[in-house]
């Protein structure tokens, strides 16, 4: 099986080959022909299944005809976080290497003026977080009446983050004749309601969920006292005694705990950075680059901020808080033990907690 049978253009197939990919993933194989046939698609798939290319590749093929007009994007992709939006932009840069398309990223933490200039030039692909998109719309800087295709990605995370009212508003602002691609890892009742309201006779594409953890990751539990300072002390002892610790991501359930733990680790002499939703974009980008380059050893993060991040070689994961959802546990520890490397994931369980995973 290869990409050539999916109906993609020669330019796209050449870019995929240049990127080193030879065969489509199941979500790509199932979704791409329906996208090219202009059908609405409901894709149930998690991050890591190749779903981003399942919409970027056919979009590139479809956008080879036509031109963008000022302030009127031809296609719109909604992402829950700035980092996911930036990664989709990178996907268009990689697979669109043979195209001359204007792609704009509209996210918080970046100057309105810079984004406004991009919109004025005309945009083929607009990738945005819901809040910043509506900010531009309300300022009169953006018209959504020319959107031919709408992608709503990570819809269940949108629900977790309280974005569903924004999503509903945006769906009503774009033409009802547009094509809609809707991706979610789970289908709670509220998400099902949204799909029934805004998708037209969609093709449902579902791939098996990678709901198991990899064999190359050692999973451990560590008991601690109930108080936050007890957990911080336990974490410090675990880090100091860890064998082969190259770097580590430490997960907290709440962004305020991310900031508190980060400051505590720094006070105790650890090389650490934080990643949470209240940081502006430049600070988040700088934190990630420091971690990727090995300039800091520890990255303290929330689930939402770390969703979809591509950091290939992480030796240790620490769950400072027991994750609320089992899926979050799988996502968290999936950051280590990649590509055949060994990894270690340790969950700290306070006296009053029960491990959920």
Give the residues covered by each predicted segment.
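Conserved helicase RecA-like core
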Residues: 2-357
């Amino acid at each position: 099986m290869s990409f050539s049978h999916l109906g993609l253009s020669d330019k796209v197939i050449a870019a995929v080959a240049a990127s080193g990919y030879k065969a489509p993933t199941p979500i790509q194989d199932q979704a791409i022909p329906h996208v090219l046939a202009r059908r609405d698609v409901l894709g149930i798939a998690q991050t890591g299944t190749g779903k981003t290319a399942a919409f970027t590749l056919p979009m590139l093929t479809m956008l080879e005809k036509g031109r963008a007009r000022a302030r009127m994007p031809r296609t719109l992709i909604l992402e829950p976080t700035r980092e996911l939006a930036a990664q989709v932009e990178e996907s268009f840069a990689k697979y669109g290497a043979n195209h001359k398309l204007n792609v704009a990223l509209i996210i918080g933490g970046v100057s309105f003026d810079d984004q406004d200039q991009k919109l004025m030039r005309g945009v083929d692909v607009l990738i945005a977080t819901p809040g910043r998109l509506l900010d531009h719309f309300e300022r009169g800087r953006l018209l959504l009446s020319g959107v031919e295709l709408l992608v709503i990605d990570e819809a269940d995370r949108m629900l977790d983050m309280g974005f569903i009212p924004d999503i509903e508003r945006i769906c009503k602002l774009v033409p009802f004749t547009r094509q809609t691609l809707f991706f979610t890892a789970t289908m709670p009742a509220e998400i099902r309601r949204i799909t029934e309201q805004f998708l037209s006779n969609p093709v449902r594409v579902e791939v098996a969920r990678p709901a198991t953890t990899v064999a190359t990751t050692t999973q451990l539990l560590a008991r601690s006292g109930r108080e936050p300072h007890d957990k911080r002390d336990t974490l410090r002892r675990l880090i100091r005694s860890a064998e082969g610790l190259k770097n580590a991501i430490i997960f907290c359930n709440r962004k305020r705990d991310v900031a508190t733990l980060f400051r505590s680790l720094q006070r105790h002499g650890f090389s650490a950075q934080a990643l949470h939703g209240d940081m502006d974009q430049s600070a988040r980008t700088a934190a990630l680059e420091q971690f990727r380059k090995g300039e800091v050893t520890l990255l303290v993060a929330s689930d939402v901020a770390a969703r979809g991040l591509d950091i290939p070689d992480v030796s240790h994961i620490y769950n400072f808080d027991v994750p609320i959802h089992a899926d979050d546990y799988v996502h968290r520890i999936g950051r280590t033990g990649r590509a055949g490397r060994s990894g270690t994931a340790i969950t700290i369980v306070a006296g009053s907690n029960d491990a959920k995973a």
